Amino acid sequence: MHLMLVLLGLAALLGTSQSRTGCYGDVNRVDTTGASCKSAKPEKLNYCGVAASRKIAERDLQSMDRYKALIKKVGQKLCVDPAVIAGIISRESHAGKALRNGWGDNGNGFGLMQVDRRSHKPVGEWNGERHLMQGTEILISMIKAIQKKFPRWTKEQQLKGGISAYNAGPGNVRSYERMDIGTTHDDYANDVVARAQYYKQHGY
């Protein structure tokens, strides 16, 4: 009896730890076409698509790993898949490599997740927990806006729509098939999802 209770408790604990980052869907179940050639070309790649996204994510992995524990901590706190946070960080700042003193986008984007100071007041250090919390909370607000706008979409479709909205706002997401039209290089969610799937395979 005691052993049964211990096993049940362990099963509940494992279930909780899994669900603690899966509130907004499973990124591995999201379809993606990966990076457009417009995103691949500046990275000096002569191919596009999922392979290009994965190659860029691979190049960023060493820098990303410096923040792995922090990304996972924030993901658990906010119930967001850490791989999705990592995918956004790779796309936005190459895990910090593209920033000058923590800033990018001509001085408008702050931190690893490039919080736009024209829309939000950046908080914390550019590579710290408060910044990652803020960026991830912005992502959650976008996912929730898409959930409200498209209630019949699956969780995974809403997750992808929220990622697209993180770049161009929920108003830009007009249909599932064309959600990335109007995002940077017209591929934002597809590229981020493909990178996130790579990071998922590398312990995020």
UniProtKB/Swiss-Prot annotation:
SUPFAM superfamilies registered for this protein in UniProt: Lysozyme-like (SSF53955)
Any one Gene Ontology molecular-function term assigned to this protein's record: lysozyme activity
One GO CC annotation: extracellular region
InterPro entries (UniProt xref): Glyco_hydro_23, Lysozyme-like_dom_sf, Transglycosylase_SLT_dom_1
Superkingdom of this protein's organism: Eukaryota
Catalysis: reaction(s): Hydrolysis of (1->4)-beta-linkages between N-acetylmuramic acid and N-acetyl-D-glucosamine residues in a peptidoglycan and between N-acetyl-D-glucosamine residues in chitodextrins
EC number: 3.2.1.17
Keyword annotations: Antimicrobial, Bacteriolytic enzyme, Disulfide bond, Glycosidase, Hydrolase, Secreted, Signal
One Pfam assignment: SLT
Cellular compartments annotated: Secreted
Enzyme class: hydrolase
BP term (GO), one: peptidoglycan catabolic process
Keyword Disulfide bond among record annotations: yes
Disulfide bridge map: C23-C79, C37-C48
First-listed, main subcellular location of the protein, grouped into a coarse class: secreted
Endpoints of the signal sequence: 1-19
Signal is among the record's keywords: yes
Function: Has bacteriolytic activity against M.luteus.
Note, other: Shows preference for N-acetylmuramic acid residues that are substituted with a peptide moiety. It acts only as a glycanohydrolase.
Family to which this protein belongs: Belongs to the glycosyl hydrolase 23 family.
The protein's name in its UniProt record: Lysozyme g
Provenance organism: Struthio camelus
